[in-house]
Amino acid sequence: MEPISITPAATLSPEDLDALRRAKQVLESPSLTMKLTGMLGAPVEKMIARLPDFATGKINDATQLALRKCLNIALRTLGKPQTPDAEPDKPSNLLHKLAVATTGAAGGAFGFLALPVELPVTTTLIFRSVCDIARSEGEDLGSVDTQLQCLAVLGMGGNPDKDEEDADLGYFVLRGALAQAISKASTDITTKGIAAHSSAAVFKLVQTVASRFSVQVTEQMAAKSIPAIGAVLGATVNTLFIDHFQQMAHGHFTVRRLERKYGSVAVKAAYQAIDGSPTR
């Protein structure tokens, strides 16, 4: 008897369908805002309201600097030959968490005074972790597209226009919103190499990611602005921060791995057919 394929999801193997289900659960999971609220036992929005007036400007400046540093790392990585692995090693998520927890301890102890130093270091560690996860899912880190996709992960989960109807964007809607900026930046970098660092297309991509990433950085800083938060809770907040992006990266690059195997149309149809609610 011939196999029956009733739904798009049936075209994926059981193992790959399970992987896609796990990816959807993390990609459509509660926002960082809700995670921080759950950890701290108080709405993050109230903490944001208590931030000093100069906070937004400092956070935006630090975010831009942090993403520029990540872009420099990406441009230096491009074109380096990757060692082909039959089975890529698992990512070093725990090591990256421990490193980010250390920077969070400093941030918790010194607050906004540490921001210009802490955020670029923390963001670089998160970016390296995202790249490590991408590699574990079969991505080529010497590829322009892969590096820009890693940068784009930092823009997942934060929306600068929270009052708009589409503030809580689904994964494929958000991915589509970033796709054009990634494509134009990729073309510039492929054509101009490292000189594309200052091109309009690359600047636009950094701005697009920064507008979303800064929302989550603001939430992170608000959580660490509690009086006498100290180094311990500062480290805990940073650990939650990197865990959020590690989960986004695992989900995003799992979807991309399956798209390389089955095609984007089949994977998107299967994704939409899956119940993304957590199974407990």
Where are these regions (language model features)?
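Glycine-rich active-site/cofactor-binding loop and its immediate structural neighborhood
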Residues: 95-117, 121-124, 128
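Terminal, membrane-proximal amphipathic helices
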Residues: 1-103, 128-280
